[in-house]
Regions:
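N-terminal accessory targeting/assembly segments
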Residues: 1-105
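Short, glycine/charged-enriched secondary-structure capping and boundary segments
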Residues: 24-26, 78-79, 109-112, 138-141
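Short, well-ordered coil/turn elements that cap or connect secondary structure elements
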Residues: 25, 58, 117, 148-150
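Residue-level signal for inorganic ion chemistry
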Residues: 47, 115, 127
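Structural beta-sheet core signal
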Residues: 96, 124-126
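Short, glycine/serine-rich, charged loops/turns that create anion-binding
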Residues: 101, 129-130
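Histidine-anchored nucleotide/phosphate-binding helix
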Residues: 107-121
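Canonical P-loop GTPase G-domain recognition
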Residues: 121, 130-153
């Protein structure tokens, strides 16, 4: 049986198994090659471009290489104090959402710091405006958020 190697993009993570969409549109459930996760613990995240190897006899393709990233959204790994955790890669814009009736300004600040560190364009979207008591209330919240983040709300 022949093995095929292709380039694709991670579009979903499901219980640690990336779903990779190939350039021809086909999707493959994958696992990471042992060589990737030993030592440096490089794991593909949503948005990563990866090289996969697959054979018809296997139920999962194998991610053999994570291609260089243009951007990363990184946070401290909650399980290990010193190790950063990459959440997403290779994006142009980050959209931070908060419900307009319950904006948590401290959380929004933390999310915006992480987002701005990537160098990507950042937007804030306030959701659930229909649950507010009045349009004036929504406008007051929008102004508070705009004072924090700028005009793109």
């Amino acid at each position: 049986m022949e093995e095929t190697v292709a380039i694709g993009c991670v579009v979903k993570l499901d219980r640690g198994f990336p779903l990779v969409r190939l350039e021809d549109g086909a999707e493959l459930r994958c696992k990471h090659a042992t060589s990737l996760v030993k030592g440096e613990r490089v794991r593909a995240v949503i948005g990563d471009r990866v090289r996969v190897s697959f054979a018809e006899r296997n139920d999962k393709a194998l991610i053999v290489e994570v291609l260089p990233r243009t951007r990363e959204l990184v946070r401290k790994d909650p399980t290990e104090r010193a190790v950063p955790q990459v959440l997403a890669a290779n994006f142009d814009r980050i959209i931070v959402t908060q419900p307009s009736v319950e904006v948590n300004m401290r959380r929004l600040e933390r999310e915006l710091v992480l987002a701005h560190e990537t160098g990507a364009a950042v937007s804030v979207v306030l959701t659930k405006a229909d649950l507010a008591e009045s349009e004036d209330e929504v406008e007051r919240v929008r102004e508070r958020v705009r004072a924090l983040v700028g005009a793109d709300v």
